[in-house]
């Protein structure tokens, strides 16, 4: 079995880890960073940029730079969360044919799993560059509070990226795995995970290799992006008051505000005040305008007060569901970049009544946990048992539009549960099964996962036919539902996949597109490497030609010069093979030049050791045993 990589596919940043020599290792990307921005951009020339490259050009290309796509994954276009994003995103969020939220760049529409797949490909490439071998198997993390659609969409993203997703694992559970792998004593742990786009709280019992999730809660639309947006709004409002200009209509200015807001927020984690300076932010009839203002930590905490207050509810609910009080919790583990904010740490301390544990790297711990889980699945890590839970209740719609729950939230997975239902009318030939996920009493208030029909029920008075509905949740938290007529033995099942918005045909097409793009990327990389080698060859040959050109035959010299001209011509192209061929031809032609160089080096110099130096010693009558010593005058 090949290596299994662990990927933390984050809203703001992503990270990849692997087990090596019994230890989890976080792998640095080609830019040397251990985390990669989860950003994808499409340049003017059609090139696709991922990670730091995409982030660097965001200000000048805001409409085609896609970020925080994880917030759209598995979501419908008409939900409140998506409407909020549409209002503030510089790029287009569009409605797909099946009502899913998609994005548009350079006139082409992309599904969120497809954009996420581009980020996953970058993480896959990072691991392959490090290992020197192809990687296909992966464990990918998701927020614990992700519903079935979001989990399925994440799995689809992995498939599009060319990965075999062995397991979808909850982020807090992965963090607990990284924290508690070497701990033998039993303890109750709360994992407080506030990342770029989502908030999770999970309560676990761990000890001696067993990691049991007791409860989980959260908000899949609360994270660093929301804190940034409040700071952006504050800066824009202050500038409007001061200059009378509204920056919200200028996408380029807004992108600069976004970067400045994120930078200011990060700086205020370690300092009490920061300066925000954005020269030439806009212009009016009187000339260019510069944005200069100060933001204090106290002001930031006031601006973000509402969001900070939202963190408490899910924590209280999670403790209640686990049957524990704050005093029962032994450790609180902080995960996610937002937990560096002092106000968040104070909030955690107030909720749990103890100082949180800051012993793990909040940016890397989830990927490390995913890497460990990869080791568990491969058999490299022994004696680890992970018992996770389903975050939301599952059920079906019954008479009167009521949701009847078959599996309650926080049930350990994998699990299977059956219940017998009957018909609501006489001689009813079919039963429609409406599969739901959520905590509300009425069906309309919960999320629809899918619909299917069990047909061919023999005519009978209502209440007589017996229809057994079975829910099956696998270890990834993905749902399978079946319905069986116990009278006839007829069965109908549904694997809730349509909710991710991508059919098998669409996923297969995206896989093919991704593969062809990977080939293009490889060709570009090969061309760049060949060009770099050629450039080095041209430089060294031209330099040698200047120094030793007069030592070789004029015909040979002319041949070398011609080969340099030919190589320079093909270097501008994208054909790696042509560049390599021209480089080899130049190297072949330059052999005579190399011979001349070595011959020149072997000849005794004007004042060389052999020849005049030795003769001079004899003439001066110096004793052979006297050693000449160099000395250096030291100036004091």
Swiss-Prot record:
Keywords: ATP-binding, Chaperone, Nucleotide-binding, Phosphoprotein, Stress response
Stored InterPro entries: ATPase_NBD (IPR043129), Chaperone_DnaK (IPR012725), Heat_shock_70_CS (IPR018181), HSP70_C_sf (IPR029048), HSP70_peptide-bd_sf (IPR029047), Hsp_70_fam (IPR013126)
Biased composition (Basic and acidic residues): 603-625
Induction conditions: By stress conditions e.g. heat shock.
UniProt key word Repeat: no
Modified residues (Phosphothreonine): 198
Residue span of region Disordered: 598-636
Pfam families attached to this UniProt entry: HSP70
Gene Ontology molecular function terms on file: ATP binding; ATP-dependent protein folding chaperone; unfolded protein binding
Family per record: Belongs to the heat shock protein 70 family.
Protein name from the UniProt record: Chaperone protein DnaK
Higher taxonomy: Bacteria, Pseudomonadati, Thermodesulfobacteriota, Desulfuromonadia, Desulfuromonadales
Gene transcribed to yield this protein: dnaK
């Amino acid at each position: 079995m090949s290596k299994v990589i662990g990927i933390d596919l984050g809203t703001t940043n992503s990270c990849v880890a692997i087990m090596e020599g019994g230890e989890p290792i976080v792998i640095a990307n080609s830019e040397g960073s251990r985390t990669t921005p989860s950003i994808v951009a499409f340049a003017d020339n059609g090139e696709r940029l991922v990670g730091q490259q995409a982030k660097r050009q965001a200000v000048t290309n805001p409409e085609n730079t896609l970020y925080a796509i994880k917030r759209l994954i598995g979501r419908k276009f008409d939900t409140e969360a998506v409407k909020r994003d549409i209002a503030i995103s510089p790029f287009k969020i569009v409605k797909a044919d099946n009502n899913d939220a998609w994005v548009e760049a350079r006139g082409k529409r992309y599904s969120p799993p497809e954009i996420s797949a581009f980020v996953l490909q970058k993480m896959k490439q990072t691991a392959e560059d490090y290992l020197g071998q192809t990687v296909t198997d992966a464990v990918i993390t998701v927020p614990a509070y992700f519903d079935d659609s979001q989990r399925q969409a994440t799995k689809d993203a992995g498939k599009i990226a060319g990965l075999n997703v062995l397991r979808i694992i909850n982020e807090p559970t992965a963090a607990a795995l990284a924290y508690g792998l070497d701990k033998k004593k039993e303890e109750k742990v709360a994992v407080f995970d506030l990342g770029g786009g989502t908030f999770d709280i999970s309560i676990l019992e761990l000890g001696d290799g067993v990691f049991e999730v007791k409860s989980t809660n959260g908000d899949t639309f609360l994270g660093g992006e929301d804190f940034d947006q409040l700071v952006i709004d504050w800066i824009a409002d202050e500038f409007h008051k001061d200059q009378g200009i509204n920056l919200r209509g200028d996408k380029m200015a807004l992108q600069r505000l976004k970067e400045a807001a994120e930078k200011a927020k990060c700086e205020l984690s370690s300092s009490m005040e920061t300066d925000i300076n954005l020269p030439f932010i806009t212009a009016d009839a009187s000339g260019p305008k510069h944005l200069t203002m100060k933001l204090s930590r106290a002001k930031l905490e006031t601006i973000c007060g509402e969001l900070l207050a939202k963190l408490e509810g899910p924590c209280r609910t999670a403790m209640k569901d686990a049957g524990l009080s704050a005093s029962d919790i032994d450790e609180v583990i902080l995960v996610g970049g937002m937990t560096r904010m002092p106000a968040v740490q104070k909030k955690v301390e107030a909720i749990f009544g103890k100082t949180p544990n800051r012993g793990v790297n909040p940016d890397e711990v989830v990927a490390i946990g995913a890497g460990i889980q990869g080791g568990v699945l491969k058999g490299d890590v022994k004696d680890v048992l992970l018992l996770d839970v389903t975050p939301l209740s599952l059920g079906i719609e019954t008479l009167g539009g009521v949701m009847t729950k078959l599996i309650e939230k926080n049930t350990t997975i994998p699990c299977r549960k059956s219940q017998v239902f009957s018909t609501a009318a006489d001689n009813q030939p079919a039963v429609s099964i409406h599969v739901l996920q959520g905590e509300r009493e009425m069906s309309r208030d919960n999320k629809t996962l899918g619909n299917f029909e069990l047909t061919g029920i023999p005519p009978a008075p209502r209440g007589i036919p017996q229809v057994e509905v079975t829910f099956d949740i696998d270890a990834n938290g993905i749902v399978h539902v079946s319905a069986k007529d116990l009278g006839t033995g007829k069965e109908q099942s549904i694997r809730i996949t349509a909710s991710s918005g991508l059919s098998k045909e669409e996923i297969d097409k995206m896989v093919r597109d991704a593969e062809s793009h990977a080939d293009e990327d490889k060709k570009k990389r090969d061309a760049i490497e060949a060009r770099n080698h050629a450039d080095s060859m041209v430089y060294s040959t031209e330099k040698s030609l200047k120094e030793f050109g007069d030592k070789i035959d004029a015909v040979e010299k002319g041949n070398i010069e011609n080969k340099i001209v030919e190589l320079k011509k093909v270097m501008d192209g994208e054909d790696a093979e042509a560049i390599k061929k021209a480089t080899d031809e130049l190297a072949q032609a330059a052999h005579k030049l190399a011979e001349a160089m070595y011959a020149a080096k072997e000849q005794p110099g004007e004042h060389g050791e052999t020849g005049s130096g030795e003769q001079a010693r004899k003439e001066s009558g110096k004793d052979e045993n006297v050693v000449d010593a160099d000395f250096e005058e030291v100036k004091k």
